[in-house]
């Protein structure tokens, strides 16, 4: 685990990003899904944020992270709620803007903690 983990606070260049499999998770996912650490965080560098509460477009920051580091893959963990829709959208836009071929996977969790 690295520190910081908030998307807004993490630097755009850091040694822990080199060759990393990245997890970009909505804030609520770790609380809704009981085995979040083992199933999603293990072996990944984790960034968290809430598109609704943070009120920013993460695409710019993520683009800089992708441009400045060798990211191997990105897994997005989001909730089924509409406000989480911005997270995979921002990641996909950032990968496209970086010009790199980084695989993106999206995992969706419902409020009861089930994978959907």
Stretch-by-stretch model annotation:
Residues 1-116:
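Iron-sulfur-associated redox domains of electron-transfer enzymes in respiratory
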